[in-house]
């Protein structure tokens, strides 16, 4: 008996038009804007906005199955051979807010409030609270920059020159993941060597 969840890759490869993918023609546009504003004392506000688009030079070939955007999670699950780009959205499991094949468009908005606990040279430590929202789409017909998956939470970051940035976040996803009906709830995210 075979597992109904098992997919034989050789059958799926035969369904793909190999000539269509002989020469991959695509372009990828990304925008990311981040600002740091000192509020009161040591408290810093960090708003940011991101947008990404994957397009095709030749509409007859369509968008390539590689280099697509996968939204959700901490961004650490991006080690794959298909060139996927994982866009972190705390409060949700990794890659849970995109279709199984990824998406061609994404947008993400963040607002983070940071407070440094210590700024020593050997170890800088700061606490943060955040709100984030984002979504991924297949094309501009389904694109709606106001229909977003939302989350909020708090975290802690430690920067040590020998190890880089380490951190932990606790995020609450207010919306269901794809195929779900209940809010996602709390997720724990570990941060290693990257900056949100």
Predicted regions located by residue number:
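C-terminal outer-membrane beta-barrel translocator/porin domains of Gram-negative envelope proteins
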Residues: 1-117, 129-130, 137-139, 193
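Repeated loop/turn-to-beta-strand initiation elements of outer-membrane beta-barrel proteins
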Residues: 41-45, 118-121, 158-168
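Outer-membrane beta-barrel transmembrane domain signature
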Residues: 90, 134-151
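Hydrophobic alpha-helical bundle architecture
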Residues: 112-120, 143-144, 157
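Conserved active-site loop/cleft motifs that coordinate metal ions or position small ligands
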Residues: 126-130, 164-171
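Strand-loop-strand
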Residues: 144-160, 178
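Outer-membrane beta-barrel "beta-signal"
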Residues: 158, 184-196
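Outer-membrane beta-barrel translocator/channel fold
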Residues: 166, 170-186
